[in-house]
Amino acid sequence: MTVGGAPATKVSRLVSADESVAVSGPPPRFVGRGGEKLAAALERFGVVLTGKRVLDAGASTGGFTDCALQAGAASVVAVDVGRGQLDWSLRNDERVTTLEGVNARDLDPAMLPYAADLAVVDVSFISLTKLIGPIAACVAPEATILAMVKPQFELGKGRVKGGVVRDASERREAVSGVVAAAAEHDLAVRAATEAGVPGPKGNREVFVRLERGAATAAAERDALIEAAVA
């Protein structure tokens, strides 16, 4: 981005009425940067969304919702504890049902128009271990859950300096904790991968693919997690 013909490198840059503002490069594919993260995970996991009914827990501006629709999803229920954040284009899309002011930990199947074929999860300031149960109750028996693990919100208070988890062993602990919580709800990890785009502060987030069925062998489970956090 340039302002008055010069690169604008700080968000605090003030702009006068007579200065020109220009943005170079291609426009973003999605309404939020999370869309790029989900798109990369869908490709790596080989997940096809064509015709699927999706639950987006922690929708925010709608990056995941936008990505899901562009990937062929039939419909999306966008859930977020906040209000007024979802991009206007999605808010007015007939394929999107918006549930604002709803904490994902309070989700109940009766709130949704359907049992989702797939759930995508991107939440902050709360551990995924508190959300797995309610989300699992809102999806179909054969559904897939793609949850993005943010290590900085999975580790205990006081363990994350500067808001960034840099140690691979701590990232492993965070992902393992989510996988263990999922197992309590008969969900097994089938795949794991580092998110393609780092978090705003540089945190390396990890997507886990969870599905019901036979438990993944411990050695395979640990290998999946290790590869994703290495």
Locations of the language-model features?
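Glycine-rich SAM-binding Motif I of class I
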Residues: 62-63, 84
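S-adenosyl-L-methionine
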Residues: 74-130
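Conserved S-adenosyl-L-methionine
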Residues: 67-75
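Short, glycine-/aromatic-enriched active-site segment of Class I SAM-dependent methyltransferases
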Residues: 151-167
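A short glycine-rich, Lys/Arg-flanked "PGG" loop and its adjoining helix->strand segment in the class I
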Residues: 129-146
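Conserved class I S-adenosyl-L-methionine
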Residues: 49-60
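Flexible, glycine-/basic-rich loop-and-beta segments that form/coincide
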Residues: 204, 209-230
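S4-like RNA-binding module at protein N-termini
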Residues: 1-48
